[in-house]
Amino acid sequence: MKTARRRSRELAVQAVYQSLINRTAAPEIAKNIREMPDFAKADEELFNKLFFGTQTNAAEYIRQIRPLLDRDEKDLNPIERAVLLTACHELSAMPETPYPVIINEAIEVTKTFGGTDGHKFVNGILDKLAAQIRPDEPKRR
């Protein structure tokens, strides 16, 4: 059974994905997501923080992620990009959530929406990113 927070993360990734693919305005995307049946079981506050925070800071997050990639940024799968951007926001702006939880949730969301081994790629990038963004947080794995 999925928690409200997991649903919020999944919906935020779907919203970020839509913004990457369709270039639709964030308020319109959020409205569409809120109309989805799963939204009633989600944490609306977390969804809003993740989606709108990611949208606001996406350019900065891309700058942080780019040096960690093993491929050209243009070759990133849009789902992987959406997961990485959303997790980068959570790592940067939500210190109350331990980074291993953020990474695990990102892996699970990638398993749901991404390609066969996409979760392994996301895990590797987020491990490096967490070490940069939260160098003083003890490793909890």
From Swiss-Prot:
GO terms for biological process: DNA-templated transcription termination; transcription antitermination. Keywords: RNA-binding, Transcription, Transcription antitermination, Transcription regulation. SUPFAM superfamilies: NusB-like (SSF48013). Transmembrane segments: none annotated. GO terms for cellular component: cytosol. It holds the Pfam family NusB. Belongs to the NusB family. This is Transcription antitermination protein NusB. It comes from Neisseria meningitidis serogroup A / serotype 4A (strain DSM 15465 / Z2491). The gene is nusB.
